[in-house]
Every structure is written in structure tokens, then in C-alpha cells.
Amino acid sequence: MRSETCFDYSLYERFPTEKRPDSEVEELNRIWRAPKGWARLTAVNNNYVGFWYVVTAFGFFLAAGILALGMRVQLAAPMQDFLGVDTYNQFFTMHGTVMMFLFAVPMVDAIGIMLLPQMLAALDLPLPTLSAFAFWASFVGGTMFILSLFVGLVPVGGWFIYPPLTSLSFSPATHTDYWLLLIGYIELSAVARSI
């Protein structure tokens, strides 16, 4: 019998142990069963957390695609006035940052979160609650990052906040500080994911 965590119980036969109790499989399935309804958002099972990462990463991919579309509309014809200079630079900065830190890195981590326990014939990651915390930290940080577009807190420093463009002469406001704060928060979740 296979559980929803895709753990193959025939792997128990490899180990020279005594016969397992008949109720053990049912008890493990009961323990690892995900909560129902809205409580499912509190699940710590690696399959659910990995799925959340994939869905969230594709949501951020869509947001970055909308930013790229705005930039392409601006560049479609000469002397276009669709985006202002600062807004274009903000779109450029946000597009690169979202694609790198909120799509590419979490997608690779999601594959690891979903496949690693199955490759090791384990029920879950060693620290499943830390993995769930990392997802929620990434989700909250990424959402605040996207919302910074609507409150005018996006810097104009390029994909990785190039130092000449973030100096006081080019970027006098606190936008770069806000970007660094949120990237630090998102990278905190990346460190928690890697543990």
C-alpha cells in the first residue's frame, strides 16, 4: 500500500528487524494525513510544501511576465510614453529580482523539497516545520516585494542593485533600503530551506 507521501512500505523489508505491527501503517498514515479545509495551510508535509512552492513560484513568474510585457510595450515603438524613465527602471529592477529570487531559486528548492525525501526513502525532510516556515517567509516577503510596486518603494538600481545606480546621486530615497530589507527576508527563507 502507498500513502499520500508516496513512501514505499516494501522498503521496510530491506532492514533486518522484527515483524512490524499490523496497525503501524495505518497509524503512520493517520499521523501524516494533511488537515482538512483551511487547516491544510498548516501542513508540514514535504509534498504540500513543495507544491505550494511551485504554485507560488509560478504566480511570481506571472507577475514578472507582466512586468516584462510592460517593458516590451514601452520599447515597441520609438518615443513611446507608456512608462516613464523611473517607472521603466523600476520595472526592470523588479522583473530581474522576481525572476531570480522568487521564481528560479524557489523552483529549484521546490524540486529538492519534493524529491529528496523520496530519493532517501524517508517520510519527510528532517525539519518539516522549518521547511513550512521557509515557505511562508518566502511567500510573505515576495508578496510585500510585489506590493512595493503599488506604494512606490521600488529602487531603480537594476537586477542586482548595481552600486553606481544605488548611490545617493541616482537613488536618493530609501527605496534601496526597502529592497535590501525584503531581499534579506526572502534570503532568510532560502537559508531555512537549505537547512
Residue ranges and their predicted role:
Residues 2-195:
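...captures the hydrophobic TM-helix bundle architecture rather than a specific catalytic motif
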